[in-house]
């Protein structure tokens, strides 16, 4: 019984622009595209979670970032085609701790299909430092297949297409500065100022500070605002330093001197 083998084409995952096709690799963002050798997984249990190397033979030491453009999973059932049951295969990024967010893609296949194949496009980069730690895993869960423990009912073959590069930030300040043809200082400063002003984070912080300042001013006014006696509670007579309105500037108080010191008599 032969296992289905598939050699993916780069064009299946990546569409090169006319500029990228003409220009040398050093002048384009695309540095190299490598097709790694296959990684074979044999499922021994009904549920398996194992690491998978999607970057075999990819030159990670020469670059800073690597992206998985696509991966082709080919499965071959090692049981008769009339057997009931199926399998669920999930590709996982084990760096993410949230079980709902770590799943990159999921595929289901019935045992009666005998062989199956699916393509996964993660479409994101990781640093080569993380890539060397093999951040990807495959979770295989066989369902409703009546087979004793210890046997191998399924074989998986994975072939991936990877892209490596030294720069992944394409819309940052670095790209704008490099694009300046005239080495004029004013032109450089203009690009920097325009970029900083356009960043949403700076605007968000500025707006937050303004809102916070207004809220604090309202709190100061309401703190010392006069309230009628009917709203007074049992704790309103507890003198606290923050509840006492203090005046540090002396104020003149008029005194009526007529009648001062004279005894009060009833007419």
Curated annotation (Swiss-Prot):
It comes from the Viruses. It is found in: Host cytoplasm, Host cytoskeleton; Host cell junction, Host plasmodesma. Keywords: Host cell junction, Host cytoplasm, Host cytoskeleton, RNA-binding, Transport, Viral movement protein. GO terms for biological process: transport of virus in host, cell to cell. One of its GO terms (molecular function) is RNA binding. One of its GO terms (cellular component) is host cell plasmodesma. Transports viral genome to neighboring plant cells directly through plasmosdesmata, without any budding. The movement protein allows efficient cell to cell propagation, by bypassing the host cell wall barrier. Forms a ribonucleoprotein complex with viral RNA. Binds microtubules and modulates microtubule stability. Can bind double-stranded DNA. Belongs to the tobamovirus movement protein family. This is Movement protein.
């Amino acid at each position: 019984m032969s296992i289905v083998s598939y050699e993916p084409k780069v064009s299946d995952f990546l569409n090169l622009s006319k500029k990228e096709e003409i220009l040398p690799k050093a002048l384009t963002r695309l540095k190299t595209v490598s097709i790694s050798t296959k990684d074979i997984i044999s499922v021994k249990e009904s549920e398996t979670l194992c690491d998978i190397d999607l970057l075999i033979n990819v030159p990670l030491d020469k670059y800073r970032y690597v992206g998985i453009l696509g991966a082709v999973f080919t499965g071959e059932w090692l049981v008769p085609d009339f057997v009931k049951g199926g399998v669920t295969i999930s590709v996982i990024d084990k760096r993410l701790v949230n079980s709902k967010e770590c799943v990159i893609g999921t595929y289901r296949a019935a045992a009666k299909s005998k062989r199956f194949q699916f393509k996964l496009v993660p479409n994101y980069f990781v640093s080569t430092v993380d890539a060397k730690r093999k951040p990807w895993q495959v979770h295989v869960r066989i369902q409703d297949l009546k087979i004793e423990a210890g046997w191998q009912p399924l074989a998986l073959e994975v072939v991936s297409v990877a892209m490596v590069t030294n720069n992944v930030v394409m819309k940052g300040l670095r790209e704008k500065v490099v694009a300046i043809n005239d080495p004029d200082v004013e032109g450089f400063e203009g690009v920097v100022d325009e970029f900083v002003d356009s960043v949403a984070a700076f605007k968000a912080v500025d707006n937050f500070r303004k809102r916070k300042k207004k809220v604090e001013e309202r709190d100061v006014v309401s703190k010392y605002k006069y309230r009628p006696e009917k709203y007074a509670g049992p704790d309103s007579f507890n003198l606290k330093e923050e509840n006492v309105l203090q005046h540090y500037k002396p104020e003149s108080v008029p005194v009526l001197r007529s009648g001062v010191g004279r005894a009060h008599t009833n007419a």
